[in-house]
Amino acid sequence: MLDRTIPFYNIILRCDRYLTTTPVLHNGYEFRMYQDGDERKWAQLEYEIGDFDSVDEAEQYFISTYCSKKALDITERCVFVVNEKNEIVGSCIAWKELRNDILVASLHWLVVSPQYQGKGIGKALCQKVMQIFVVNDEFPVYIHTQPWSYKAIILYVRQGFKIQKTDSFSQYENQFNFAMNTLKKILPENQYEELTYNIEL
C-alpha cells in the first residue's frame, strides 16, 4: 500500500521520445481494453489502494472524467491487465489534458492491486499505454504524480520520462523543490541519485 503519511507535492514528468518496447506479462495474465461496465471494476481497484473514499466516488469520477469526452474514446485508451479468472488486477489510461489551451498527452492512473504488485504488471501497463501514444503520435507525454508514488516515479524515469523543474500542464503547480527534498528523505541514496540524473529544466 502507498504510504500516505509522506507529504504531498506535485511532481511533473515528461517524455519527449519513446523507444517502443514490447510489454511482457507472466503466464496467466493478459491485456484487455475497457468495455462497458468496467468503470465499477476500475473503481473497486482504485478504492482498494486508497485513492478514493468509496467505490461509488471512484466510479462517478471515472464516468465524468473518461466516459463523457466525445473527442477521446475510452475503449481505445484504458488498458487493463486481467488474471486467469478475468479479474482486473491493474489499469492505466492514455489520456489528454490542456497545457496552455492545447491538448497534450497524459498518462493517468497507473495502478496495480496490492496482492499482484511485484510481478512486473505496472511496468507492462506503462509500456502498453506508451504504445498507444506512439501509434497516435501524441508526444510529449506528461505525468502528474506525488512523492508517495516513489516506486512509480522510478519506473517512469526508467521508461524515458524526465522530472521537470519548471514545466507543467493542466492545473498543476510544479512543486519540484519540495517534492525532491521529500524524495531525498525517503529513498535509498542510489535511487535518489538515479532520479537526479533524470531531471530536465
State the predicted function of each range:
Residues 143-153, 169-180:
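Conserved beta-strand-loop-alpha-helix junction that forms the acyl-donor binding cleft
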Residues 1-27:
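Acyl-donor-binding surface of acyltransferase catalytic domains
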Residues 34, 110-112, 145:
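Hydrophobic adenine-recognition pocket in adenosine-nucleotide-binding enzymes
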Residues 133-145:
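Conserved GNAT acetyl-CoA-binding A-motif
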